Each structure stands twice: as C-alpha cells, then as structure tokens.
C-alpha cells in the first residue's frame, strides 16, 4: 500500500509488474534466464490526465486495478517501501486486458 503515498502527475500511470511464472503447467521449474521479461502489470495509481491545446484535461485510458500490457523497454523505476513500481505515460501503455 506504499503506492497510496505517491500520486502520479499529468498523464503518468504507476504500475506493479506481475511476477514471472517460475513453474510450468507440467511442474517444471524454469531458470531465471528462460522466464522472459514480464510485460503485464496491474495499475495501482493514475494521474489526472494531460491538457490538450484548448486547456481541457484529457481523460486517462486506464483505471486503478486494470491489468495492462507494457512495452518491452521504458518506464521509470520507482521504489516505495522496498517494493518496485514503474511509471509510464498513458500513451506508452500498449493495451489493457478485459475480463
């Protein structure tokens, strides 16, 4: 809950990456090198949005609690109470998962 003390500004989105799977469905343990980079995350905080040329606030495309797909590279690492979070621009998020 450390992210509750951090409020992203403008069109920034704070996410917590999901853990990589360490065991296959068949029960085989995967070494770290073969796990791959985690590209899925849960949104934990969003900024109010960015301003357009008319001075109106553009609404964010994601909400807190949604699962999103991240780009392979990018984002700013933020450490809050010994836990890693990542800060992305709203436009950098590739998509969101729908239940």
UniProtKB/Swiss-Prot annotation:
Give this protein's Gene Ontology molecular function annotations.
ATP binding; metal ion binding; protein folding chaperone; protein-folding chaperone binding; unfolded protein binding
Check the record and name the InterPro entries matching this protein: Chaperonin_GroES, Chaperonin_GroES_sf, Chaprnonin_Cpn10_CS, GroES-like_sf
Q: Does the keyword Manganese apply?
A: no
GO terms of biological process kind? chaperone cofactor-dependent protein refolding
Q: Please name the SMART domains in this protein's record.
A: Cpn10
Q: Provide the function of this protein.
A: Co-chaperonin implicated in mitochondrial protein import and macromolecular assembly. Together with Hsp60, facilitates the correct folding of imported proteins. May also prevent misfolding and promote the refolding and proper assembly of unfolded polypeptides generated under stress conditions in the mitochondrial matrix. The functional units of these chaperonins consist of heptameric rings of the large subunit Hsp60, which function as a back-to-back double ring.
Name the chain's protein: 10 kDa heat shock protein, mitochondrial
